Amino acid sequence: ITPIACQCTFPESHPINHDKPLLNTKSPTYKHVLIPTDVPATEWPSKVELVPGSLISEFTSLKRESLDPMYPVMISNIQVQDPQGDVLVFPDNEWHDVPYVSKFMTGNLTPNGIPQKGIQNKNQYVFICGHAQRDIRCGLIAPELAKEFEHVLRHENLLYDKAKNPEGVKVGIVSHVGGHAYAGNVLYFDKE
């Protein structure tokens, strides 16, 4: 398999720190809520949670009153093919429709809540931070990384295809994750 050459050039004002160790640099989270959006990642504002009327805005505004700070919940927008609900929650690995955000948060995102059952996710996911308005390097490198992941997964017959491989790996873009020492941070979620 021939790798695709990355044609990215980053602004000199935004270098990548190649010396800082990556292992165990992410803060632990209790849950990660991923919210599909039709807005292309190239159009996401720097702070997606401040977009009035958006689902991520509603989740973010209720976080303090609905969640336990001892059990941190990360909330992100995603751009992904064929979402199966309003939100995808890990490590629960479930898609949910969320008619009442506050009720969903206290039931599904707290350790003592009474969760509503969702639809079991059947796919693995690779999400790449492509939030250009937050970090231009991510906006530049994410499309290249996505192409490479899709290229390799297609070659290995693992890439999602609605007709041919409905349980395949989906590759998508996620809003800002990680610090700014790196660019194009990659999240992998197994279906197990």
Positions of PLM-derived features:
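Histidine/cysteine-enriched polar flanking segments
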Residues: I1-E192
